């Protein structure tokens, strides 16, 4: 297993923070309001409404997970990028697939629970197929052992997608294929991260996959919690299915 620690520099940080203060406050309040609504129907409504401004808002947060995950996949994938079929789980508006497309990958299937997000993903023209699915409630609507790469970015966290979905990601991946996952490292997500890493290690002990790399990133995104400031950390995990 390879473990890397990344300390990412943010260009023109001070000047941009001053310029974005009002926007950041608005985005922070929006996200905190979503965390308060635990009911599934409320969350769906939130994401459907947020979809139109999602990309602008996460840019204010310096949300870098989609790029970091795409770079991780592109660095270790040694096959034919144009022929590789990628399953983008919790795809949102398509940020991860957009980065992967710029890196030479061409074939994408997207899954998300929000029809509003899927509508915008559809407009990108990136995806050959898009499916609606409530992860953790519905079974992932894909055939087993069908994808060269499976990615899930931003949704493996407390109050979002349950840890058990990780086994479905493995099932969707071809033997020899890759699964790329991310999670946040802030205090509110520590219990979830511990549970997630326990599941990942258990599957490694079961010989289902092997660890390719785990990248700890110090500056993942700007903190929104009232008891945190600056940036929170995050982690990119890349595993290769063995059977």
Q: Which residues does each PLM region occupy?
A:
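Residues lining the SAM
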Residues: 152-153, 182
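A short glycine-rich, Lys/Arg-flanked "PGG" loop and its adjoining helix->strand segment in the class I
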Residues: 163-175
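Class I SAM-dependent methyltransferase SAM/SAH-binding core
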Residues: 84-139
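N-terminal auxiliary segments of SAM/dcSAM-dependent transferases
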Residues: 2-41
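A short acidic, Gly/Pro-enriched loop at the edge of an enzyme's catalytic core
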Residues: 139-150
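Conserved alpha-helix/loop element of class I SAM-dependent methyltransferases that forms part
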Residues: 63-83
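Conserved class I S-adenosyl-L-methionine
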Residues: 178-206
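Class I S-adenosyl-L-methionine
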Residues: 205-243
